[in-house]
Amino acid sequence: MSAALKTYAALVVMHGALCCGPARADWRDDIGTFRIGIVAEPGAGNTVPGLALLTQSFTNALGMKVEFVVARDYAALIEAQANARIEYAIYSATAYATALQRCGCVEPLVAPVDSDGAVGIRSVLLTRDGKLSGLAAMETHRIAMPPPDSVGGSLLPLMELAAEHAEIAEDAPFLIRADTASAAETMLVDGHADATFGWVRAAADGQPLLSGGTQARLEAAGLSPSALQVVWMSSLLRYGPHAVRSDLDPEARRRLTVFLTNLKSTTPDLYDLLESKHSGGFLTVAPKDYATAQAIVRLVSADGGRQ
C-alpha cells in the first residue's frame, strides 16, 4: 500500500469515528447497515482486494455502517437488490438493465470512463479491401460473428439491426458463428470471411475511439489500417453503472455521488481498488443512458430468456 493510501486510511478511520456517533439522520436509522453488492472476479471466491479500506471509505462518505456483500454472479446480485437485501450494486450494463426489468426499483448513479474519455462501446461491422459494400449485400457474402453471448459482437448488432429493419436471423446461412471473438477476427484475417462483427470503444458523443477494440486487434494481426472499412456502426452501449435502489434517500445519493465523482482526483489508489478496468474516474449517469442495454435485454427476453 502506498504512503498516500496509508495516510488516507488513517484519516478515514479517524473521520469515520467522528461522523458515526449516536446522533444520526432518520434515513440512516431506517437503513441500519448500508450494503453494497459486488460480483467477485473469477477465481477470487468471496475476496475483494482492499475490502477493508473500501468499506471504511464508504462508511466515511455516508456516516453510517457499511458492509460489502459478494455475490456469486450477476443473477444473485440482481435478486439481492430487487429484494432490498442490498442498497447499492456494481453492474455491467446488461446486468443493470436486467435488474431494472426485474423490479423497476433501481437507478444508475455513476459509471466509469476510460482515461481517454471513452464511456462505452459501439458494435461495428468491419470488412477488408471493400469486399462488403453495405448491409444489403450481406446475404451474398460470408459474415463472421462472435458467439451468441458476446454483447458487443452479437447481442448488440442483432438488436440494433432488427430496430433498423435489417434483422438477421441467428441461423442465417451467410453468418459464420465463431467460438470466440478472436476466432471471428482470424476468419477475416485469413480470408475465410468477408466481414466480421466486433466493437470499438466510444466517447460520450458517440465518436469511435479505435484503440483497444476489434479494429486495433485486426491491425495487430497484420491487416493494414487502410484495408479495413467500417460498414455499419451501432449506437453507444455505456459501461456498467453503480446503481442504487430507487427508494434510497436523496441525501444518501448526494453523499455517494460527491464521494464517487471526486474519488479519482482525490484518492486515485482507492479509485483503482473500486474500479480496475476503466481508469478515467466516475461520471454521473441517468436511466436514459442505458436505453441500449435495456433494448438488448428485451431482445434476449423475447428470444427465450437467454442470459
What name fits each language-model region?
Residues 142-249:
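Pocket-lining segment of extracytoplasmic ligand-binding domains
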Residues 27-53, 244-307:
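An extracytoplasmic/periplasmic, membrane-proximal ligand-sensing/linker region
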Residues 105-118, 227-233:
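A structural signal for short loop-to-beta-strand junctions that line the ligand-binding cleft
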